[in-house]
């Protein structure tokens, strides 16, 4: 069993960590792999070549660092390509899904917004998975039950669609406690991706385990909603307070903002 993490950004796009730093901090957490998803629009061919080469150079018998991209689409939808390394020219999400799939990579709609659910359900081309918990977008305390319900409806059409659980790591002061436990005996990137695609994993956060199927008891989904609502209320209070300070011309120190990112 390998411990790892999904959905991270480096200084190749808008992250604060270098690839070497990411390897070091996740190794220190007892992880064996990390799936990168730097933003595709930051790259040209020379930089994507450097990115892939550096990821490969940081793979060894202790750790697998897997290059991948996050594609920005119409209506601010984001689609992760775990193992994808070719930028795209289209902003149509279904074209992007096909583009990712053509690379034998894993296509995952990242942190889908509530108002995009109906649109996603109308897609003719569906992704390999839905990111049902993104601890940057949803918060560290609980995901939205509605994202799991979206996945459940899509699974009527695509039974092998998976639930993915990502950190969306950007900042040095950010929560990093959601991990992916992978039933895999190899650190080869291709093998790790194959095990992810086959759903041979579960998410782990403290004592909570969440399956790759995304099928959860109704009681747990209800608890998620209550916890998420409480966290959201606290976050909105702080956001409104910051907005008031901004209007008064008072700048919130970066150290305080960094601490808030870690808490939420």
Specify the residue positions occupied by each region the protein language model found.
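Charged catalytic cores and adjacent phosphate/nucleic-acid-binding surfaces used
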Residues: 1-6, 19, 23, 75-86, ...
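Histidine-centered active-site/metal-ligand motif
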Residues: 7-9, 39-40, 77-78, 101, ...
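Conserved beta-strand positions in the central sheet of alpha/beta enzyme cores
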Residues: 35-36, 108-109, 131
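Aromatic-lined carbohydrate-recognition surfaces of secreted/lumenal glycan-active proteins
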Residues: 106-116
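An N-terminally biased module of ancient metal coordination in phosphate/nucleic-acid-related enzymes
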Residues: 1-74, 254-264
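Surface-exposed amphipathic alpha-helices with a cationic face
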Residues: 3, 27, 53-59, 92-108, ...
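Short, flexible loop segments at the rims of nucleotide/cofactor-binding pockets, characterized by
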Residues: 10-14, 44, 84-88, 108-109, ...
